[in-house]
Each structure stands twice: as C-alpha cells, then as structure tokens.
Design a protein with these regions (language model features):
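Loop-to-transmembrane boundary segments
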Residues: 69-94, 200, 215-234
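Membrane-interface amphipathic/juxtamembrane segments adjacent to transmembrane helices
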Residues: 30-73
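Membrane-water interface of transmembrane alpha-helices
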Residues: 30-41, 131-136, 192-207
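Aromatic- and Gly/Pro-enriched helix-to-coil junctions and flexible linker segments
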Residues: 74, 81, 101, 279-284, ...
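Membrane-interfacial entry segments at the cytosolic side of transmembrane helices
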Residues: 146-154, 249-253, 275-289
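Short, strongly hydrophobic alpha-helical membrane anchors
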Residues: 1-12
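Alpha-helical transmembrane segments and their membrane-interface junctions
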Residues: 81, 86-105, 164-178, 231-250
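Alpha-helical transmembrane segments
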Residues: 13-27, 119-129, 174-193
C-alpha cells in the first residue's frame, strides 16, 4: 500500500501548484485590464458608442482594442468572461487550507501557547472567520458608508488590521498570516462571484435589449474592483510568507501585516497613476521603502515575555513518536544534524531565525515535526541543505524506521 504521508505530501504539492497557476491567471488578467482601462484614449475617429481605444503590440502582432459603454452595432454572439480564474484561485486555495492547515491542525494551525483549543474548534473558528468576514465587508459596502469611497477604505483597513491581530491571538504565526491572506482573498473572489459578474450580466442584458442600464450596477462593480486592485499585492505577500519566519514568527507580526497592506496601496497607486498617464509619483516608492525598513526593524524587536511557558510536554496527537523505541537515537541525531539551524537562537552563520520557524530542540518539538522530518530528511535529501552536516544514509534510514514504526504502533 502506498504510504499515506507520501500521498498526502504530493496532494499538498498538487494543490499548491494549481493554486499558483490559477492565481497567476487571475492576477495577470486583473492587472492587464486595470492598465488597459486606465490607458484608454479618446480619439475623434472612434465608432459610435466607443468610449476609448488602445493600440498594443505583443508577440509580433498589433492589437487594436476599443471599449464600449453601450452595445456596439455589431454585437458578437460570444463574449469572453474573465471570472473562472478568480473562482478556481479561491477553490484551490481553500483546498490547500484544508490539506495543510486542517489536515495538520495540531501542528500548523494550533499553538497551545497562544490558545489551547482542539483541532475541530480551531477549524470551525477558521471557517467562521472567512464567512463572517465577507458578510461584515459586504454589509459595510452596502451601508451609507459605502457612498464615501475613502471613508469606506479607512474602515475596511481597520477591519483588516483587527482581523490580523485577531488571527495572531488564535493560531500559529504561520497560520495567522495564511488566514489573513485567505480572509482577504475570500473578499476579493466573492466580490467577483457575487457582485461584479452578476452586475455585469445585468448591464450586458440591458444593452443587448436596447435598454439603458441603471448606472448603479456599474458604480457598485467599479467600487469592488477598486478594492480588489489594492488588496492583490498583500495577498501575494501572505501566500509567500510561510517561507519567511521573520514575517510571521515574530512578536509584532500583526503590525507587520498591517504595514504590508499599506505597501500594497502605495505600490498599486504608482502603477495606477502611471497607466493613466498622470505622471510617475515617485513618492510612493519612498514611502514603500520606509515601510519595508520599518517591517525589517519590527521583525527583530524582542518579545516581552509575560510568563513561563511549558514547552516540554508532548501533545497527545504526537505521543506515539516520542514513545517509539527509536526516539532516543532520533533525538541524538536531530541534536547533532539539525538543531544548529532549528533552534531558538540558530548558530549556523547567516540565520537570524530557524527556517520556517521550525524548532527541533525538545522532545515535544521533534515529535510534533515527525512527518516533516520523515519527508525532508528521511524520504528525501532536502534536509540538511546540501547535506552540510554530513547526515549519513544509515541515519536517514533511522528516521524512516522511526516514523514508520510509530505509525504502525498507532494503528495496532
């Protein structure tokens, strides 16, 4: 029988790959149409009903694009809708959330030092936060506040900052950042699925029927598109953050997250202004650099300890790994081959934090990361990188034997 751990690892990889592919498609088409729309030029010779045009060159050919706010005289039977990129990005991201964070909740989702809850409770909180977050956002947009574009943006930013702080009070730092990205992406994809596309269909149907569309549908869709425009870059940051513990695994991670959203605004403002041919506001890059330097500084600020934490107890979900007969030898192996990097204060040159914030110093930490040790150093040679600590083939076999023995013992 094919090993469950190996199959699960490949399933996670497939979901991540699919998620990246669909995200590239969604973000690429989104950025393209934003640039196209802002760069449209009104010329005298445009056909009746045309709002503007753009000439582009790519791949050895020329493209002449015209935008109509009313139905053109010759309406084609087929219209290309840009929506499935968004839907599949969210679905693949949710699948990855289920595989990695729900399937491995005891390790990746729950930090008992932050909040000691069961895996089912943590998963329910996660799901509820995504659903409630969209409802709150949608109600704010539909409230009287929604008529004030910038006032709404400020309130939404406050909501996002609160969610970032809240997630760090519930989950591991890595899961908190992932959830903040998922929360934001849920808003963006729901905007497309529940607001933008339905409103566009109403407008298209009216135009084809020769009716004058209600301007409110376009205004609402434009507002949601504006939000998506400025939220895109922070979501990408949170997608990548689990590789960088200095972002998610530090004392002021929620403040870092808040600043990332401001960086997303300054960067997108430069591109939006440039595409609209309204100049190149270089001040946005100065602000972005200042924010990034502030983030770097925050990542090194020490955490003020408020009490003693018991880090020695092995969680029940991982007891079989610590109780296995191979564990004593594995602990010695990890101590000599891995802990110079995977320590609270790494001694390996150039490391300020342990890779992915994975600590392998105590029985509890080694047992909790048994599957990762098995995959990374037992079944593959990914760890240590370049085999810098000279782990031997026999030692890798020991790691495999330990994991398989513990799993077999649990199943008996």
């Amino acid at each position: 029988m094919y090993e469950y751990a190996i199959a699960w690892e490949w399933l996670a990889f497939a979901a991540r790959w699919f998620h990246v592919i669909t995200a590239i498609a969604w973000i690429g088409s989104s950025f393209y149409f934003i640039a196209l729309d802002l760069g449209l030029v009104k010329r005298p010779h445009l056909p009746p009903g045309a709002y503007g045009e753009e000439w582009q060159v790519h791949g050895g050919g020329f493209y002449h694009i015209q935008k109509y706010l009313v139905a053109p005289a010759q309406m084609p039977e087929h219209l290309t809708w840009f929506k499935y990129e968004s839907y599949f990005t969210w679905l693949s991201g949710f699948l990855m959330l289920c595989i990695v964070y729900y399937g491995g909740a005891d390790l990746f989702l729950i930090d008992s030092h932050v909040l000691d809850i069961s895996a089912p409770a943590a998963i329910l909180i996660s799901l509820a936060s995504l659903a409630v977050g969209w409802i709150v956002y949608d109600l704010l947009c539909k409230s009287p506040l929604g008529k004030n574009t910038w006032g709404l943006m400020v309130v939404l930013y406050a909501v996002i900052v609160f969610m970032g702080w809240g997630y760090t009070q519930l989950f591991t730092g890595r899961a908190a950042f992932l959830h903040l990205g998922a929360f934001t992406a849920t808003i963006m994809s729901a905007n497309v699925f529940m607001i933008i596309i339905p409103n566009q269909k109403i407008v298209v149907a009216d135009l084809i029927a020769g009716r004058t569309p209600d301007a409110k549908y376009g205004a609402i869709a434009k507002q949601r598109s504006l939000h998506n425009n400025y939220l895109t870059l922070p979501v990408i940051f949170f997608m990548l953050s689990n590789h960088y513990p200095l972002a998610f695994g530090t004392a002021y991670n929620w403040v870092i997250a808040a600043l990332v959203f401001l960086m997303g605004v300054t960067i997108r403002h430069w591109f939006n202004t440039t595409h609209a041919r309204k100049g190149r506001p270089t001040w946005t890059w100065i602000v972005t650099v200042i924010l990034f330097i502030l983030i770097m500084w925050l990542s090194t600020v020490p955490k003020v300890l408020t009490g003693e934490k018991d880090t020695q107890a092995v969680a029940p979900a991982f007891q079989q790994f610590a109780a296995d007969a191979h564990f004593h030898a594995v602990k010695q192996l990890v101590g000599t081959r891995c802990s110079m990097c995977h320590a609270a204060e790494p001694v390996y040159e150039g490391l300020a934090r342990p890779p992915k914030n994975v600590l392998l110093e105590t029985d509890a930490e080694i047992a909790a990361h048994a599957r990762e040790i098995y995959i990374q150093a037992g079944r593959s040679h990914a760890m240590p990188p370049g085999n810098v600590t000279d782990i031997t083939p026999d030692e890798r076999k020991l790691l495999v034997a330990w994991f398989q023995s513990a799993i077999a013992g649990k199943q008996e």
